[in-house]
């Protein structure tokens, strides 16, 4: 007997955060309504990596998806949509931000690494263009390793301008 998965009840309290990051793998813990509630109440930027097909379109919200997830979206009219394109880099507002060409050993965790560097870049520079390139550089470092890779301090120095 499997227990029915219940949606995660998260109190919305984002006032003291520099950013909110939502990684939602659409397993039923985080409802679409809760994501919208978090975005609506946030006084800081919200970064979402989600498998859901309905996503918020708000000025303070950045949505990161990959090519496959892009094809499944219900609404393509999202202002701050970031589409990761593997070795090509990412697209934001119809502009390609190219990635450095590297030898790829393992892509596991590359999207999470991209998102972490993107968020770090944005909260430290408030510049989305620089942040996207930081995300690309971080993911390029991660895919050169076997398995899930956590950036070192030396790696972080490499991704900074």
Where is each model-derived feature located?
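Conserved phosphate-binding/catalytic region of the ribokinase-like
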Residues: 13-19, 33-59, 72-161
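A short beta-strand/loop micro-motif in the catalytic core of glycosyltransferases
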Residues: 61-67
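Short acidic, glycine-rich surface-loop motifs adjacent to enzyme active sites
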Residues: 17-29
């Amino acid at each position: 007997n499997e227990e029915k998965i219940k949606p995660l009840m998260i109190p919305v309290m984002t006032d003291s955060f520099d950013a909110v990051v939502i990684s939602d793998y659409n397993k039923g813990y985080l409802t679409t309504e809760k994501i919208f509630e978090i975005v609506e109440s946030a006084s800081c930027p919200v970064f979402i990596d989600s498998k859901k097909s309905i996503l918020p379109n708000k000025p303070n919200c950045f949505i990161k998806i990959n090519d496959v997830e892009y094809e499944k979206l219900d609404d393509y009219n999202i202002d701050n949509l970031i589409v990761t394109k593997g070795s090509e880099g990412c697209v934001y507002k119809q502009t390609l931000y190219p990635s450095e060409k590297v030898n790829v050993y393992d892509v596991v965790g590359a999207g999470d690494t991209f998102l972490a560097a993107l968020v770090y870049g944005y909260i430290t520079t408030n510049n989305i263009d620089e942040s996207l390139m930081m995300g690309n550089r971080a993911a390029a470092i991660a895919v050169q390793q076997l398995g899930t890779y956590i950036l070192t301090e030396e790696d972080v120095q490499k991704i900074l301008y």
